[in-house]
Amino acid sequence: MSQTMRVFAAFALPLVLVACSSMPESLAPGMSRADIEQRLGAPSAVHALPEGTRLQYSRQPAGQQVFNLDLDAQGRLVRVDQSLDIERLQRIEIDRWTRDEVMRQFGRPAVVERVARFDGDVWTYRYLEPFSHARLAHIHIDTQGVVRKVVYTDEPLLDDVGNRF
């Protein structure tokens, strides 16, 4: 191995190890909330659950993932779930889910907008479909806080004119 490669490896390895330790999917069941927050930092949101607490780590608006870390009543990690995928988005129940349920499952949206033909907000989430196909989920929430419609579109390419993200 050349001297340059050894120097590169010496600097790169610690960076890779730090990056891996800050990934929610690398956490082991049973970890305490304090250990989780020491590793990942403060969550972007905290939600009460019937059986414990959900710590939410969102990569929105720039990223395409939201990790839900569910803790039991004793504050121990039970489950890590990357919730922004088509399977979970398609579980949204039109005319039943509320703004709070969307927030608890998917966190804060990347964008909140209003459109002319809908009386309410449109929450837009960035997510990836299999094989890294970038998509947007537009969740229409009326003024009473009820989900009325979900529309899926392709995310504009970075070089598209007028790209908002």
Can you annotate each of these PLM segments?
Residues 1-12:
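Bacterial N-terminal signal peptides that target proteins for export
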Residues 16-19:
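C-terminal motif of bacterial Sec signal peptides marking the signal peptidase cleavage site
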Residues 21-165:
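Residues within mature, well-folded domains
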